[in-house]
């Protein structure tokens, strides 16, 4: 089987879990531990990507440049990567990151808006970067239409396109259908990626399904030993928005049991998760009534802490806020609507 490409997101998606408050020294320590453990790629940025530090998304404890430079100092084998959301980050931000040593980038859009990634993907490809398309909130688009969006990203120059389960809402069958749809339209050399969240406790299971279906070329049956590279996102101790991402150390252990080539030291990952990352969590990254509600309602995982603050301020149940956000089909970038929803619910309770 073609080796897996494991990308750690502790230092990007994991920012959401601690309100973007990693210090430069913590970034350096975590990046060094991941590099030593053999991870292929390490993503570094504000939780909402380059230039995400703001009133709307939350201010970072340091700048993207400071975090990226800290990681670059300690990496010896891992690829330094970042993420950019068009409309938040710009090509100028990407140029600055590249100058600091970033060689790979994911361009992230809502699952129906691939067309806004054309300029950014094109620039990255033309300038020698590894570049992926990152179709967020993948549960909000059916498999065929999502695959059509992936094909657009491929046409702009993406080396890989992800099924991005930002809400942790996809079931295993949903992942299989979307990965299979990608296989039908993408060229054999284009890689397929999975970015799972653990809100329904399916982060690892969904990643396994993505590997099983994504590594096949064309219409071969499951188990066909021919391969396309599958990229899998995960994070130490699951550090990420909502109930977190697929826990890296758990996924690697499962990959080992499957006999998949991954290149990582599972014990070193366990140690980094337990000794370095988990002590940083001011709110446990786990499935609980609030994070389960994210997956149940299909809500953008990074809404969690915003919703918890609004619930406390206006005296409403955070689950009610999350379910209503899901009903209204709010997506990333609409964080300002969380307070509106909380006020609406508080008003109804008073009448």
UniProtKB/Swiss-Prot annotation:
Catalytic reaction list: (S)-4-hydroxy-2-oxopentanoate = acetaldehyde + pyruvate
Homology family: Belongs to the 4-hydroxy-2-oxovalerate aldolase family.
Gene3D superfamilies cross-referenced by the UniProt entry: 1.10.8.60, Aldolase class I
Entry-linked HAMAP family: HOA (MF_01656)
Binding positions (Mn(2+)): 13, 195, 197
EC number of this enzyme: 4.1.3.39
Binding positions (substrate): 12-13, 166, 195, 300
InterPro entries: 2-IPM_HCS-like, 4OH_2_O-val_aldolase, Aldolase_TIM, DmpG_comm, DRE_TIM_HOA, PYR_CT
Domain Pyruvate carboxyltransferase, first and last residues per copy: 4-258
Protein name: 4-hydroxy-2-oxovalerate aldolase
Site (Transition state stabilizer) residue list: 12
Pfam families: DmpG_comm, HMGL-like
One Gene Ontology term from the biological process aspect of the record: catabolic process
Record-annotated active site: 16 (proton acceptor)
Keywords per UniProt: Aromatic hydrocarbons catabolism, Lyase, Manganese, Metal-binding
Domain of life assignment: Bacteria
One Gene Ontology term of the molecular function aspect: 2-isopropylmalate synthase activity
């Amino acid at each position: 089987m073609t080796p897996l490409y494991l990308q750690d997101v502790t230092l990007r998606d994991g920012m959401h879990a601690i309100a973007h408050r990693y210090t430069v020294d913590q970034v350096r320590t975590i990046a060094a531990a991941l590099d030593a453990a053999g991870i292929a790629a390490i993503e570094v940025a504000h939780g909402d990507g380059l230039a995400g530090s703001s009133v709307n998304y939350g201010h970072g404890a340091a700048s993207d440049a400071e975090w990226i430079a800290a990681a670059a100092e300690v990496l010896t084998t891992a690829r330094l990567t970042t993420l950019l959301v068009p409309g938040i980050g710009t090509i100028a931000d990407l140029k600055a990151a590249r100058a600091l040593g970033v060689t790979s980038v994911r361009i992230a859009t809502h699952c129906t808006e691939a067309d806004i990634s054309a300029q950014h993907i094109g620039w990255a490809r033309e300038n020698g970067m590894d570049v992926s398309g990152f179709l967020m909130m993948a549960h909000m688009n059916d498999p065929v239409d999502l695959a059509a969006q992936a094909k657009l990203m491929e046409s702009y120059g993406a080396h890989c396109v992800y099924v991005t389960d930002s809400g942790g809402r996809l079931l295993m069958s949903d992942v299989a259908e979307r990965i299979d749809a990608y296989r039908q339209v993408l060229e054999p050399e284009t890689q397929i990626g999975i970015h799972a969240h653990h809100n329904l406790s399916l982060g690892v299971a969904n990643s396994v399904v993505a590997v099983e279906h994504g590594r096949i070329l064309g219409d071969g049956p499951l188990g066909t030993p021919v391969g396309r590279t599958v990229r899998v996102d995960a994070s130490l101790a699951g550090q990420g928005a909502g109930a977190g991402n697929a826990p890296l150390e758990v996924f690697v252990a499962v990959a080992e049991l499957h006999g998949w080539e991954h290149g990582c030291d599972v014990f070193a990952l366990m140690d980094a998760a337990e000794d370095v990352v988990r002590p940083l969590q001011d709110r446990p990254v786990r499935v609980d009534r609030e994070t389960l509600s994210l997956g149940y309602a299909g809500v953008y995982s990074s809404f969690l802490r915003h919703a918890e603050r609004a619930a406390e301020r206006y005296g409403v149940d955070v689950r009610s806020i999350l379910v209503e956000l899901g009903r209204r089909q709010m997506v990333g970038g609409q964080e300002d609507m969380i307070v509106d929803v909380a006020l609406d619910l508080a008003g109804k309770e008073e009448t």
